[in-house]
Amino acid sequence: VLVIKKSVNKTIKKNIGRIFRMHNIIEYKSPEDYLSIDDFYKCYGYVCFYKSDGNKQNEINISEITLTLVSSGFPRNLVKHLKQVRGWKVEKIERGIYYVSGNIFPIQIINTKKLSKEKNLWLKSLNLHLESKDMVNSLIQEYDEHKDEKLYNSAMDIIVKNNIRIFKEVNENM
């Protein structure tokens, strides 16, 4: 679980961050894992604990919290549960991004496999099976522009380790 605090006056234009408010709880499931109904309730509990952790009464306003659930697969059972048991709506906003409405705080579900490569190259690439050599070349090109940044280094390490075969193939053809 990751918590991202957003500045009050800062607008996020990135498609996966448009829903963000002041306090954003993010659950990222590894490519081998899936997002279950119980994972949802665990994360929902994290939001409640986070909200209650202020130094004074109602210091963290529930309307300033979001929950983002990130998974490489589409959580069909969870979505069915949210619709049928909770009575919430789950709406596809764009490729790989779904908003859940009906709750007191905004929730989004991100399916990394379905994300647009053009808009979400790095997040989409954090999986075990990169789609193509073109995608690897795009990653390498963008990485070259940011190789001095720790975040890019960390992400690239994970991506290469998870996709060593295709990176070797691309390297041999260079």
List where the protein language model places each region.
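Elongated, amphipathic alpha-helical interaction scaffolds
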Residues: 1-174
